[in-house]
Amino acid sequence: MKASKELLQKRLYKSNQVLNANSPFVITDEILEHHYHAFQEPWGEGEKVILQKEDIMQYSKEESKAIWNQNAEFWDCAMGDESNDFHREVVRPKVTELLNPDPTDYILDIACGNGNYSAYLAEKAVSVLAFDYSEKMVELAKKRQKRYADHIEFCVADATNETSLMALKRNKPFTKAVSNMAVMDITDIKPLFTSVYKLLEDNGVFVFATQHPCFVTLTEKYMTPHSYYDIAIEGQPQKQCYYHRSLQDIFNLCFDTGFVIDGFYEECYFNKEIPDIIIVRAIKIEK
């Protein structure tokens, strides 16, 4: 017998796969049908719900890019100039605290979306190079943020391709780099971390926020990197690709690349005892 939506909501507390401005954690019937198989087992006088992920597959960056191009207009409208409540209340404050932007900075904005965080930095007189691998998203970002053209340069680049990333190098190194909720959307993050290290000045700062792999990815295969389809904002045209990695995979990649982590937050939204995201500050050190 299928478990009810109410039982799953009680069991899970939240689903961070559905985010909108006013109701960030909603388990929809579509998600239940598409993503989870629920089985009943005896549990005293009640019921116990066991969740299992659907078939684990590796979705390609080409599939992911096509989906983001299809979702771009919806995403631009949904995030707007100021982003949604989740980003404004949970992501942005600690990201900005760790990034500590200054007018003297030259910041790389990774997977910039419609550019609203780049605009936030530009308001602080920061110079920004912002990129995304969705051509449609970059087109919309340029249009939406055209009033900041003197502070923001928008580019199309592939975060999984070191050659594409190193083409972002300009006459001066970046002082800082930032990624707001994008690491979980990227097929292979090793080229990104390697390139960011090379593009940053000595002692440069890399701040990234991503889904908390312990509490958000609803899977029994925590230690195994894998990918799956889900939605980020309710009503988006296409489900996007997510890429799960354990904390040790993420942290060890930082260390192996040459970064030292000197700032870390676990931030909550719906349930104040269950963090939805991690925010990491990594400092480039000489190898």
Give short role names for the model-derived ranges:
Residues 175-189:
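A short SAM/SAH-binding and catalytic strip from SAM-dependent methyltransferases
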Residues 50-102, 116, 120, 140, 207-233, ...:
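Conserved class I S-adenosyl-L-methionine
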Residues 257-259, 267, 272-287:
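Core SAM-dependent methyltransferase catalytic element
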Residues 165-177:
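A short acidic, Gly/Pro-enriched loop at the edge of an enzyme's catalytic core
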Residues 241-264:
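Short alpha-helix
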Residues 106-163:
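Class I SAM-dependent methyltransferase SAM/SAH-binding core
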